């Protein structure tokens, strides 16, 4: 019951003026990080890695899961309105879902008992949740949308995966050998950075929130 009450209290405090400002700043930082991206050697070139979830995770650890969702939303909306979308917003919506699937489970578990152990468990569960969500959405939504948006048959997209890994010979091989490793790598990287940076950044965030 205490953990539920804590989450309710955090949800109320999120909309205090100082917290709203803090969420806005973290959303802006996340947007900037989202524009800095690079490919990974084991995935096709149109999958590019960024660490924009790092400020989202840090904010959600400090202020709770609702704050994390709002930071993620600000990041995605800024990117959509400034850079536009070649997929009519579908890719941006999926990015929001992926981010929330990492951030929400991680922060909920961390808020239940704030310790290094629960942070690690939460980040592990969040990484797995994001990976599963990404695998399903890529298979049933994103890859078909990319095929239409880029005027490429699905076979051509899969062939881009085959060029990187000859074992990729179909849709689910693409998902299991490219999408899943990509998201596991991303989740582990961002989790490690969060563990390294949160204790240093946390006092600043909490001072701004509480004082």
Residue ranges and their predicted role:
Residues 1-211:
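Loop-helix junctions at membrane interfaces
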